[in-house]
Swiss-Prot record:
Source lineage: Eukaryota, Metazoa, Chordata, Craniata, Vertebrata
Protein source organism: Bos taurus (Bovine)
Bias-annotated ranges (Basic and acidic residues): 287-297, 683-692
Amino acid composition bias (Polar residues), ranges on this chain: 693-714
Superkingdom to which the source organism belongs: Eukaryota
Ranges of compositional bias, category Low complexity: 18-27
Transmembrane feature ranges: none
Protein name: Nonsense-mediated mRNA decay factor SMG8
UniProt keywords, alphabetically: Methylation, Nonsense-mediated mRNA decay, Phosphoprotein
Modified residues (Omega-N-methylarginine): 906
Amino acid sequence: MAGPVSLRELLMGASAWTSSESPEGSPTEGGGSAAGGPEPPWREDEICVVGIFGKTALRLNSEKFSLVNTVCDRQVFPLFRHQDPGDSGAGIRTEAGAVGEAGGAGDPGAGAGAGAGAGAGDPVRGGVTAAEGNRTEPGSQDYSLLQAYYNQESKVLYLLLTSICDNSQLLRACRALQSGEAGGGLSLPHAEAHEFWKHQEKVQCLSLLYLFSVCHILLLVHPTCSFDITYDRVFRALDGLRQKVLPLLKTAIKDCPVGKDWKLNCRPCPPRLLFLFQLNGALKVEPPRNQDPAHPDKPKKHSPKRRLQHALEDQIYRIFRKSRVLTNQSINCLFTVPANQAFVYIVPGSQEEDPVGMLLDQLKSHCTVKDPESLLVPAPLSGSRRYQVMRQHSRQQLSFHTDTSSSSSSGQLVDFTLREFLWQHVELVLSKKGFDDSVGRNPQPSHFELPTYQKWISAASKLYEVAIDGKEEDPASPTGELTSKILSSIKVLEGFLDIDTKFSENRCQKALPMAHSAYQSNLPHNYTMTVHKNQLAQALRVYSQHARGPAFHKYAMQLHEDCYKFWSNGHQLCEERSLTDQHCVHKFHSLPKSGEKPEADRNPPVLYHNSRARSTGACNCGRKQAPRDDPFDIKAANYDFYQLLEEKCCGKLDHINFPVFEPSTPDPAPAKNESSPAPPDADADKLKEKEPQTQGESTSLSLALSLGQSTDSLGTYPADPQAGGDNPEVHGQGEVKTEKRPNLVDRQASTVEYLPGMLHSNCPKGLLPKFSSWSLVKLGPAKSYNFHTGLDQQGFIPGTNYLMPWDIVIRTRAEDEGDLDTNSWPAPNKAVPGKRSAVVMGRGRRRDDIARAFVGFEYEDSRGRRFMCSGPDKVMKVMGSGPKESALKALNSDMPLYILSSSQGRGLKPHYAQLMRLFVVVPDAPLQIILTPQVRPGPPPCPVFYPEKQEITLPPDGLWVLRFPYAYVTERGPCFPPKENVQLMSYKVLRGVLKAVTQ
């Protein structure tokens, strides 16, 4: 054979000339490429097949390649190899990558090696192995390479397996994991990386199964002098896999021209396994210091290496016998070992190899003039002779290069060389004696067959198709069907190879019940997603304390699924929260549709939300209280409850109705918030710019007027034409006319789309809700409020039901002009000029310059307790006949939307009261009181809420009540009430809620 080729190319080339040959055709002499072309001259040779596998160390050249070079006594594999094209590491040399060639193109002996391969298209030429044909793409994750070399002189076919156990392939696999090629561009987690390595072990086992099915002799190469106990597990796995797939292999070779026993056992004979160990440098025996290395003493009977060899043989045999890999009858074993022959060979140790130094030393030896004879031009050396010269002149020996002398460097006797060790077994094959390795009282002879090259190719091709190459075949084809069955049988390897996963699964399975118990501890019957996640986190902590290994993630996911199934199977609490931030107490259910009745027996039940929380609230005007359920939607919170009380209490009172959506189509749609809302800070600045100045800032009060001297008399004034009692808005129909431009919302209200929530500063312009969350009711005329007794309504805490006075200075036209005609009639309620008023106020001011309004900010808690506040965080307390404080402080401040209730319960949680109503007594005077409520129910970026009409002019002579919304909701969800340790001033009613404009 020209040189080593991939086994795939060898079998495909042989199949090509086998299928094209004629009955009279004769073999073509002169050799040729083994991968195709003319048929080889050795097709009728009876061959011995030797398989080589094992592990390699961190060396520049593989021990397997050096072994073949040594046994064949020629350079079959080059000493240096070009770097693997698929290898990205330019600075690391492996057996699949090197920097040059061994030998020269003009070397005659290389005609059967590297030199001849160049002309025949040999892929070994140039250092790139022919195993590239068997190499797959990185994504396929196959790092097993099979190479073949046939030595025609010795009639031995060498099969070399390079797998994940070799340094070069291990390096490629690690780089694929590091770069993400094995994970589709992503780094693999621990469990998937473990699966990757176990997959490579299974692929290696398939290649080993193939070698054990087609070889007579197998060489196990190991880079140390100690036996790797993991091979016992691998061989037991291979034996189990072989017994599993034996019927499939029989089917594959049933038509091959081989013997009956071969077809029955799917192998030419039970292969004999030999072991080659590399002696460590630490165990190398050096000669005594006073002894001349050139003249050693007489060697002892048993050298240390021989004793180590015997010890390894005994150890290996005992291990395999105990694990029943070896039995008395060799025909039933995966392999055999000889009973009366050495099956362990120890390669003498050497220092770390340096092929570059070896070549430099060889160059020196050729260039140094030693004697006159060396001046003569030497004759060209043959390939074999050239190889011997390289060995003799090398400064350091390669891994398996052994001297042919009978003495080692330590003076100990070495019985045979590596070639002699191997050839004693090869000769048994070539002489057709076979292996008689059965032991016991009744040993049964094992079958043996020495095939010709052509017959071996026929059987090996079929096995290669179904065991290795058939992974890419169509599963419907016969070959693909057999391969799929073989691959499905690989699961038998898991019990032998994946011990880590097996232990990990047992460990994780024991940890699962403990994690389940931790999850279910202290659980209510129904609970929410938050409780589920907290309990699951506790269960995972318990699980992580006991679970280990690659199955950790798998059973952690199972724990997730088990806990979720437990929760969703009748233990799932409704996730809906009320507008007061309380959970629905029902288990998972659906809401009744329009006209559908609740059904608790259905699965899931059809029920309305219910948090079992009830509170007491007053109606729009505040005169009647009633219990209310915890609301879950904005309509029930701000409209339905008050509409029910309207029929019993407030229905006959005068209202100022806010504009709402009036559809022009039968099926109006809710609007989508497509407009970009203005920044909250900008809105706040604009609103503050629009905040009106109260009377205390625009006009000065009389210094002579004191709260103690004030009276209830507000005087009688003519009705203002713009705010007279005949204004239709007083009766709830029209709008109060003001000098300001109407709002954009009022001008461009849509009749097609409605606002699904409440009106606030981030809403799209031109949209109105279907109902108003605000209410403005007139309780009666101004005189219906008694300053001394306060409001006569239910639920007020004693001493807190008073309105604060708000004194407003009114300048009449006569006083401003100062020169009235004495002949003209005085204005109503005015004195005749020239006469002083009966009551003289301080500084000579007239009493009729002052008008008094009353303002009250009412807070209400969930238990129906009501009270007024005279300022931020200040509950009103009136002990006498009326409040002493003015309303100016409250009107010029941001009033809190929530305040601590004056009557806290026994619980530790604080109890809050909410601003629900604003009472305003408008005097019958020539002035206008404009109402502009603006509420921010949370810290920024919470928007500002306001009614559908931002500025409302209150008609004179009335006791008006503005009812604030019970809940505030945006498109993103409700604005929940404050919790503990929250700044209450972030929830506020902006100052400027009232302003007075004099006529």
